[in-house]
Each structure stands twice: as C-alpha cells, then as structure tokens.
Curated annotation (Swiss-Prot):
Ranges of biased composition (kind: Polar residues): 500-517
Residues covered by region (Central and acidic domains): 444-477
Localization in the cell: Cell surface
UniProt keyword annotations, A-Z: Actin-binding
Biological classification of the source: Bacteria, Pseudomonadati, Pseudomonadota, Alphaproteobacteria, Rickettsiales
Name of the coding gene: rickA
Domain of life: Bacteria
Function description: Recruits and activates the Arp2/3 complex, which in turn leads to actin polymerization, promoting Rickettsia motility during infection.
Domain WH2: start-end pairs: 406-423
Protein name: Arp2/3 complex-activating protein rickA
Amino acid sequence: MVKEIDINKLLAQENNALNTILSQVNELCKQNKQLQGLIEIQNETKELEKEHNRSLPWFKRFVKTVSNVKYILIKSEEQLTNEAIKYNNKILKDIDNKIYNIAEKSAPLKQALQEEIEKNFKDLTKKDLSKDQRARLSEVFFSYKSKPERFSALHMTNPLQFINAEALEKQYNSLNATKQNIQNLISANSNIKELKEIQKQVAEIRAEVPHTFFEKLNNIWQNVKNVFVNNSEQVLAKNKESNTRTIRKIDEQLYKTKHKFEELIENKERNIKDIIAKLPDNEKLQKIVSNLTNHMASQKEPILANASLAKPLENNITPPSPLPENNIPSPPPPPPPSPLPENNIPSSPPPPPPPPLPENNIPSPPPPPPPPPPPPMAPAQAETLSKPIESTTVKKLANQPRPSIDTSDLMREIAGPKKLKKVEFDPNTGKPVAHSHSKPAQNVNALSGLESIFARRAVIKVSDSSSSESDSGNWSDVSVNRNKSKMLKTKGERDAKMTTHAQKINNRNSQNPSFVR
C-alpha cells in the first residue's frame, strides 16, 4: 500500500512528461491511420488524456496501449514504406526512453513496469504472428525492458569489463533510491536558497555508468551537507529530526555502495589473476598484470594502454641508416658496371641489327654515321677516373630506338613508273648472272622511244668502224691477226653482225635501271 502511494505521487509529479508521451502516441496513430486497429487505440489514448488521476492502474493501461501500438505496426509492416517504418521506429524508441526515465525514479514503479511488459508480451505473441514477426516483436520489447545485461555493453576501462552485471544493476538501483532521497530532502528544505541550485545538479544526473553515477552523486551530497552545516539557523524546527534521520540514512547508503564497488573490483582482479596464472608464461600477459596492478594502486591515473602497446613496437622498428656528413641521404647502390678493357675506356655498344628489307627487296639507305669516339685519355687521367667510373652506370645504347627515316619519296624516285628487276651477282666474279628464264630480245623494229634511237646510233657506229677497219687496214688488226688472211665481208654479213650487236645492247639497257621517265 505504501509503495502504491509513492508511485501515485511520482506519477503526479511526472504529469507533463506523461502528457507528452500520450501526444506522441496519438500522432503516431494519425500517421498510420490506414492500418487496422489504430483508430481504436487513438480513442483509448484520448480517454487516458482526459483522466487527471494518474495512478498505478492508469499507468498499466497506458503501458498496454503502447504495447498494442507496437503489435499493430509490426504486424502490418508489409503495408508500410521503408521511410514510414524508420519514422515509426524512431518515435517508438523515444517513447520507450521517456517511459523508462520516469520508471527508474522509483524502484516499485520500475518493477511494476517490467511485470506489465512481460505480461503484454506473452499475450501478444499468442496472436496470429509469423516467426519473423515474433522475433521482431521480441526485439522491440527487449529495448523496452530493463535487464542487467545492458551494463555489460557499456564501454568501461579494462580490466573492468563485467560479463555478469547483476551486482552492478543492484548498485545502480540503490544509487537511484539515494538520489530520490536527496531530492526529497532538498524539497523539504526549499526555504534554503543554496539547496535550490544543488537541486538542478541532482536532476541532471542521467544515464550514467554506476561508478561515475556514484562519484557525481557523492560530490553533490557533500555539498548538501555543507549547506546544512553553514545554514543551520535557516532549518525549520519541524524538519530538524527528519533531516537528521535522512542524512544518516543517505550516508549509510553511499558508504555501502562504495564498499560494494571496491569488493566487486577486488573480486574481478582476483579472477583475472587466477586466469592469467593458468596460462603459459607470456610477456604480453605480464604487461597486463603490471597494468592491472598500477591501476589498482592509483585509480586517479588511467591505464596507459596505448603507451604499453607502443613499447614492443619500438623494438621491432629497424633504426634508420646514418646520413653522410652533408645530411643528404645516399642514393640506392647502382648495379655492377660492365667490365672495362685494359685501357680503361668503355667499349662501344654493339651495332644495332639491320632493319628488314621492304617489299621491293631494295635496302633502305643506311642511318647517319655515329659521332667519332673521343680521343683516348692519357694514362694518368685514366687512373684518376677509374674509381668514379666503377660506381657509375654505363647506359647501353643498344636498347634505344633507332631514329626513323622516311625513305618513301626516295624509293618512289628510284623505282619510277616501272618495277625494278632483281639482279643477282656471282659471289666469285662479282658480275651479274643472266637468268635462263629471261625472255629473248625481240626484233629491233619492236623497240620504241629512246631505246630505238640508241640502238640505231650503235649500229651506225659499228658499221662505220668496221668499214674503216676493212678499208684502211689498221696495223693493230694486222699485228693481232697475222696468221689470218684478210677477207672482205659482204653487205648481208655486215647486216647480220649489226643485228646481233643491237640485240646485245638492247639486253644490256633492259637490265640497267632507267632514270628517264
């Protein structure tokens, strides 16, 4: 009966916060009015707003209404868009946080909230829901519940990670009760101005880790006691006895909480040492033990985890190579140079391979000749330059591409309008070899152009020379042909000889390239 009275007082104090939650539920029903069942819930919300007596039965009806809203939204998620689902989840999460903040101010109200949530969850899961929908509803109700495991997910300094956080949950509830007692004490002595300022600081302590919650609450409580000591004349006579009992009770609660924290930490330290003792020797484990010992010796100094992890890394880093005198880092060592000849002059690179012949089998003109090699150095200079030459690299010119020379115009001028014929030379004599498959010369009358003119001139010259030789009787012919009798040739014989000579000239002209178009 006493607990229910305290709950009713708390609900009356949180009237504005409850009205805000009801307006959010009403707005959520309006945004999703197309879903079946939300209109009835909206009517229930309006009836809850009209009731001014905020009691424990009213609070249970209120929690059941919110649970029904969650059930309808999860059952009808297929009818909603992704944006609507995100918006609904955001509003529901805000509603859950506000309800839990109200309930955590009173341990009986918090217990009643948990019982009502479990009851509603069991009733709703019995309805027509699929397996996925039941899992989704469980997730929604899990965020709505208060479980001890929620403290195991909080970020705490190693090695203060508590897997089983039931003891911390008890300390957290005890600190909430102490906080409520301090607020009641300040409200009973509201005539003291200094306490009104402290009351705001107490109300600002929210969602803290138990240990930091204790530190903040303990510091504020010391200030409250100082105010009572310094302003004892302002304390009303009717409140002196109750103030004394309340102050003694709060001191005992804070002392027990602090002692329990120390006991939890010592037990955890002992468990960690027992686990480490069973493991094989390891430098990393020894560093963890030393860090744990330092943390327990001085709680004011945090564990320098980053500094301890940086030490083994320093040993693995290779020291940089020392810089030379001019503080310029030396370049990487060059590859070994090619061996030098006896005169210490690097040999010229091998000549590049000849380019392939074009289709007409005529080689392209050779590239320009390379520059002449430098004159040989004196022996003294060669000795002085021999050392730095060993440390330098000789660039190979063989890998460099040859300069491209455009010979298309030149080849066009050489080839002319007619295709050139391939000429083969005898390797022994160096003279051109006549092909057996070449066509015989045609009649002189078939010649045309300049070739026929050259042939006539050659015939005239031959006829003139033969007639002059036969008429004059040159001494060279007599000396060479002493044993032969001098015979005169007829005109037919001379014509046959001239025809044979003209054919030879024609064959010679056809084999040589013509530069006349």
